[in-house]
């Protein structure tokens, strides 16, 4: 899988530090020498790229993320984006939508997040409303699934209900993880898939390094199970991992 570091932040000052997480993740990955099946991992073979951004110029940063993401979708079979905060997912998601439209494929997005990120949009997308802006930019709302919600603002609840956005709460997920994974895979069946994962889907006991931790999340083992199931989806085109903040 091709890996792209996207050190973009627009958390209104609340996510400063997330721009460094891509390098921190790669550094940690290079210290892993085998997986739990005993297979050797050669980190020197990682296929890496970074989109160089100036976070003081949000409009330019978003254009660069979009342009580079679209090129990646057109040239790579599968890609992992390392944020950055969740604002990057607007530009990568918009590029994914345009790629699918040009290739006559049906786009699908599954978002793992404790928050809905559907507040009223600002001029440039932030980590609090990127998904709503993406929907209002044309991403088919019936093809979006929000998984793991456990702290949602009233305005967001109204938006989700009015637009009939499909959701699976954290209670749904933890009560029967295997069955919910089956539901998730069925939702993605036959569609080109983008998976966006906010690290706060995890319980802060397992992943404290994020700006908006929410108790009652998933364990690291549960997240690994999710990822292992999701990567088997043949139409999986892209994933992102966002909101890790090494300063926390």
Question: Each PLM stretch: what is its role?
Answer:
Residues 2-248:
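Conserved alpha-helical scaffold segments that buttress catalytic/binding sites
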């Amino acid at each position: 899988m091709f890996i792209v570091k996207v050190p973009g932040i627009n958390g209104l000052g609340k996510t400063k530090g997330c721009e460094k997480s891509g390098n921190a993740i790669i550094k940690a990955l290079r210290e892993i020498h085998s997986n739990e099946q005993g297979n050797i991992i050669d980190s020197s073979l990682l296929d890496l790229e970074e989109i160089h951004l100036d976070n003081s110029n949000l409009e330019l940063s978003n254009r660069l993320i979009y342009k580079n993401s679209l090129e990646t979708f057109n040239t790579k079979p599968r890609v992992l984006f390392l944020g950055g905060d969740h604002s990057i997912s607007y530009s990568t998601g918009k590029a994914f939508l345009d790629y699918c439209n040009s290739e006559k494929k049906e786009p699908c997005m599954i978002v793992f997040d404790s928050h809905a990120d559907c507040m009223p949009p600002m001029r440039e997308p932030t980590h609090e409303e990127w998904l709503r802006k993406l929907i209002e930019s044309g991403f088919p709302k019936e093809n979006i699934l929000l998984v793991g919600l456990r702290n949602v603002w009233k305005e967001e609840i109204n938006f989700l209900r009015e637009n009939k956005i499909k959701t699976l709460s954290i209670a749904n997920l933890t009560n029967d993880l295997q069955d919910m994974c089956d539901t998730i895979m069925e939702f993605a069946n036959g569609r080109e898939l983008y998976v966006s994962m906010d690290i706060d889907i995890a319980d802060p006991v397992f992943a404290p390094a994020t700006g908006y931790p929410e108790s009652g999340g998933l364990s690291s083992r549960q997240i690994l199970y999710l990822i292992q199931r999701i990567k088997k989806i043949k139409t999986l085109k892209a994933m992102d991992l966002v909101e890790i903040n090494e300063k926390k």
